């Protein structure tokens, strides 16, 4: 896994994973699988933050580059929950794979602080599982894909056209490749 100067950076992660033991597919929820552990996501997110800060990618607001503590929440939820959130906040019906609610604005409201609150990230485990089957890869890879997409949105990355989307998807692949 990519390592730089982890000692100077911190991640403040509020992590929640629903109990999926009652789902019909036993391969969907396997206790002990790292994707259900807070420590796994802390390490992944810290790695990605290190990469982003070291490369000073211009797709992100300048003020994130002097922060040392990054705070966010990540919840792994079911289709019913993500459908409810999708309807309430996005005015869209039905489940989706990932939702992110960034707290970053174009202005730095944390100028004199060394931390930043990024926002909230929700991933539907059921959608991730369906997509992992559709794309013929592991649930872990799909969860990393969805988390990277939502995480980039939390950092202010948008995709308003095909070119921006392609750039974002390529950067997601790059971030995930650095975890190996």
From Swiss-Prot:
It is an enzyme of class 3 (hydrolase). It comes from the Bacteria. It is found in: Cytoplasm. Its main location: cytoplasm. Its cofactor is Zn(2+). Transmembrane segments: none annotated. Gene3D superfamilies: Metalloproteases ('zincins'), catalytic domain. Pfam families: YbeY (PF02130). GO terms for cellular component: cytoplasm. Zn(2+) binds at residues 149, 153, 159. Its EC number is 3.1.-.-. Keywords: Cytoplasm, Endonuclease, Hydrolase, Metal-binding, Nuclease, Ribosome biogenesis, rRNA processing, Zinc. InterPro entries: MetalPrtase_cat_dom_sf_prd, YbeY, YbeY_CS. One of its GO terms (biological process) is rRNA processing. GO terms for molecular function: metalloendopeptidase activity; RNA endonuclease activity; zinc ion binding. Single strand-specific metallo-endoribonuclease involved in late-stage 70S ribosome quality control and in maturation of the 3' terminus of the 16S rRNA. Belongs to the endoribonuclease YbeY family. This is Endoribonuclease YbeY. It comes from Prochlorococcus marinus (strain MIT 9515).
């Amino acid at each position: 896994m990519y390592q730089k100067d982890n000692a100077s950076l911190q991640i403040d992660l509020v992590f929640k994973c629903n109990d999926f033991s009652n789902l019909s597919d036993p391969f969907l929820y396997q206790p002990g699988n790292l994707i259900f552990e807070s420590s796994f996501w802390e390490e992944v997110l810290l790695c990605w933050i290190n990469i982003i800060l070291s490369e000073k990618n211009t797709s992100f607001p300048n003020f994130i580059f002097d922060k040392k503590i990054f705070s966010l929440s990540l919840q792994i939820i079911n289709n019913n929950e993500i459908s409810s959130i999708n309807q309430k906040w996005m005015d869209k019906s039905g489940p989706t794979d990932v939702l992110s609610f960034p707290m970053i604005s174009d202005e730095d409201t944390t100028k004199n602080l060394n931390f930043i609150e990024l926002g909230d990230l929700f991933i539907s485990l059921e959608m991730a599982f369906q997509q992992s089957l559709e794309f013929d890869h592991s649930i872990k890879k799909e969860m990393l894909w969805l988390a990277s997409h939502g995480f980039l949105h939390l950092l202010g990355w948008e995709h308003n056209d095909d070119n921006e989307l392609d750039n974002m998807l390529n950067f997601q692949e790059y971030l995930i490749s650095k975890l190996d």
